[in-house]
Amino acid sequence: MKEIPMRDFDFIVSPAKLLTPEIVQMVSSIHEHKGKQELFLEANVDELKTLLEVALIQSTGASNRIEGIFTSDKRLEELVSQKAEPRNLSEQEIAGYREVLSTIYEGYEYINPRPNIILQLHWDLYSYSQGAAGGSYKNSDNVIAETDAEGHQKARFIPVPAFQTDEAMEELCARFLEAWEADRIDKLVLIPMFILDFLCIHPFNDGNVPLRYQQQIAA
């Protein structure tokens, strides 16, 4: 059988190629506004609390809709605010997303992108869903496909095979943390690179997109 090559997770050379003048300007602008953030936080505590509640609801709704999971706006707000129990499979997945999002908001400073942490978050994501394989990597190969106007499907890209997923996730997390701790590359460049590599691995049968959103929030 032909050997399938592993992906190369490069957080040293590749970032330099991404630093176009436009990206450098955007990164600099983000850092500049972050420096002004503390004064705004101190002066607008109540307003920011309201904005956070709205953001939690909108993030939960948007991420789940991408996965084909829907409920009414009223039920969504009740589920995210923990004022209601899930009634069906869709609402169970929404409740799981809420739990992971709460974990990240409350402890993001202590959450590192390590395989065991990512597996735990995935388990929490499906903690309300009976029979779901939360906390385990995919057990079969998956293909990201697209359908044209005539209904024909073709592969958009082929993720890492199931048998290489564990090794790929270990390598991805190790290389990312090395670059993060070395602090030679701007973290605003490293984060989207990690997210893209994570999606290219597509390590789970389900739940890859919600976890991608939550990793962005944690970062």
Report the location of each language-model feature:
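FIC/Doc superfamily catalytic core
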Residues: M1-A219
